[in-house]
UniProtKB/Swiss-Prot annotation:
SUBUNIT field: Homodimer.
Species of origin: Pseudomonas syringae pv. tomato (strain ATCC BAA-871 / DC3000)
Keyword Glycosyltransferase: yes
UniProt record similarity statement: Belongs to the purine/pyrimidine phosphoribosyltransferase family. Xpt subfamily.
EC number: 2.4.2.22
Pathways involved: Purine metabolism; XMP biosynthesis via salvage pathway; XMP from xanthine: step 1/1
CC annotations in GO: cytoplasm
Alphabetical GO biological process terms: purine ribonucleoside salvage; xanthine metabolic process; XMP salvage
GO molecular function annotations of the record: xanthine phosphoribosyltransferase activity
Protein name per the record: Xanthine phosphoribosyltransferase
PANTHER family membership: HYPOXANTHINE/GUANINE PHOSPHORIBOSYLTRANSFERASE, XANTHINE PHOSPHORIBOSYLTRANSFERASE
Residues where xanthine binds: 20, 27, 156
Length: 189
């Protein structure tokens, strides 16, 4: 997606060979026009998938997921990282390790919102080592639902998450595939 590539080149900051900071438009400050275009693209890519719901993890996946949900006319569910007083029933949950934050957390979804008739599109801001995607897949399977595919805004192809998802037979559509961050330069695949 050229508009996303351009935004990454102009406003992304390479912090190391492993970390790309995109807080100017995706995961702190949000560019609504870009999010709309991202949602439109995910809707186009998965138009044939029979998606009934979209699942993401709070917080950075919410903006692109909502835009895709709006375009596709389906609800968006976000897995919560922190349990609240209103989230009390037997939860669908999984543990996920955040590469960026270097912490492990439990993410959860209420079983009221996800069931065996759902065909679920996972949308997330990044795909690195695939741990967040695997956690969401686990939650979807706990509900007896099916995974329609994964829509990733930015994939760090050099970190192996996609290879694992491909090996498991999941459809992965990434809007920007970063091959390398070496030398402080973003190289797209």
């Amino acid at each position: 997606m050229e508009a996303l590539h351009k935004k990454i080149r102009e406003e992304g900051i390479v912090l190391s060979d492993q970390v790309l900071k995109v807080d100017a438009f995706l995961n702190h400050q949000i560019d609504p026009a870009l999010m709309k275009a991202i949602g439109d693209e995910f809707a186009r890519l998965f138009a044939d998938a029979g998606v009934t719901k979209i699942v993401t993890i709070e917080a950075s996946g919410i903006a692109p997921a909502v835009m895709a949900g709006l375009n596709m006319g389906v609800p968006v569910i976000f897995a919560r990282k922190h349990q609240s007083l209103t989230l009390t029933e037997n939860l669908l949950s999984a543990t996920v390790y955040s590469f960026t934050k270097q912490v492990e957390s439990t993410v959860a979804i209420s079983p009221r919102h996800l069931n065996s008739t759902d065909n679920v599109l996972i949308i997330d801001d990044f795909l690195a080592n695939g741990k967040a995607s695997q956690a969401l897949i686990s939650i979807i399977k706990q509900a007896g639902a099916t995974v329609a595919g994964l829509g990733i805004v930015i994939e760090k192809s050099f970190q192996g998450g996609r290879a694992e998802l491909d090996a498991q037979g999941y459809r992965v559509e990434s809007l920007a595939r970063v091959e390398s961050l070496a030398g402080g330069v973003v190289t797209f695949k």
